[in-house]
Amino acid sequence: MYKDLEGKVVVITGSSTGLGKSMAIRFATEKAKVVVNYRSKEDEANSVLEEEIKKVGGEAIAVKGDVTVESDVINLVQSAIKEFGKLDVMINNAGMENPVSSHEMSLSDWNKVIDTNLTGAFLGSREAIKYFVENDIKGTVINMSSVHEWKIPWPLFVHYAASKGGMKLMTETLALEYAPKGIRVNNIGPGAINTPINAEKFADPEQRADVESMIPMGYIGEPEEIAAVAWLASSEASYVTGITLFADGGMTQYPSFQAGRG
C-alpha cells in the first residue's frame, strides 16, 4: 500500500476493461479517487464502478470519451477537476492494435492506431500538464507503452511499433521539459498480458505456447501484475522520471530480441 495515494485524483483512459480496469481497481484500493474512462460501452464502465471499485470502498466516476477527439480529452480532465476538485495523476492507457501487412495497410489503418496510441496519449499528457503548470502541482503522467517501443519489431504491426516508439521519445521529451517544475512523466512497457485485446491470440494453444517460449519467466502476465503502476504514481518514485518500466517477464531480455527479432 502507498499511503500517499489516498485522496489523490487519478484519470485513467480506456479503463473499463483490460489493463485500465485493473489499474482503476488498484488505485481505488489505495484509496485514490478514480475517473474511469470508456469510449462506447457504458455498461462495462458502470460494472467497474459498481462491482469492483465500490467493493473495495473506493470512490470513482465514469466519463465517456474518445481519446482521438481533442474535446473529449479536455472534457475528461475537466470532469475530474469538477467532480473531485483537482487532478494528481494522468494515466494514458487507451490503445489499440490491428495487425495488417505493411504493403496492404491503408492510411486509415495507420491513422487509427497512431491517433489512438500516440496522439491520444499526447492530448492526455498535454491537458494534465497544462493543469499542473497552471496550478503549481507536482503531478504525474504515466503512459502505457509496450515492449515494442524499443527492440522488438514485429511483422504486421508497423503502425503499432511506430506509435509506441514515438511514445518513448514523447515521454522522455516531456519528462525533460517539465522536470524543473516537479512534474514526472514515465512509461510502463507491458509484455504479453492476458487482456481482451490478446484474447483471440492466446486462446490458440499453438500461438500461446509460441509467445510463452519467448518469455524467460515462462508465463503470460495478468493485468493485476501491471497494476503495480501505482508505485510510479507514489512518492516512493519521486525521483523517477523519463523512464520506461518494463513489466514483461524478461521478454525484452530474450536473446533473439536482443539481436532485433523481426
UniProtKB/Swiss-Prot annotation:
Q: Which InterPro entries match?
A: NAD(P)-bd_dom_sf, Sc_DH/Rdtase_CS, SDR_fam
State the family named in the UniProt similarity comment for this chain: Belongs to the short-chain dehydrogenases/reductases (SDR) family.
Please give the name of this protein.
Answer: Glucose 1-dehydrogenase B
Q: Which residues form the active site?
A: Y160
**Record-annotated membrane-spanning stretches:** none
Q: How does it assemble?
A: Homotetramer.
**Which parts of the sequence bind substrate?**
S146
Give the EC number(s) listed in the UniProt record: 1.1.1.47
SUPFAM superfamilies, A to Z:
NAD(P)-binding Rossmann-fold domains
Q: Which controlled-vocabulary keywords does the entry list?
A: NADP, Oxidoreductase, Sporulation
A Pfam family annotated for this chain is: adh_short_C2
Which residues are listed for NADP(+) binding in this entry? 11-35
GO terms for biological process?
Answer: sporulation resulting in formation of a cellular spore
EC class, as a word, reads: oxidoreductase
Entry annotated with the keyword NADP: yes
Which reaction does this chain catalyze? D-glucose + NAD(+) = D-glucono-1,5-lactone + NADH + H(+); D-glucose + NADP(+) = D-glucono-1,5-lactone + NADPH + H(+)
* GO molecular function, a single term: glucose 1-dehydrogenase (NADP+) activity
NCBIfam families hit by this protein = PRK07231.1, PRK08936.1
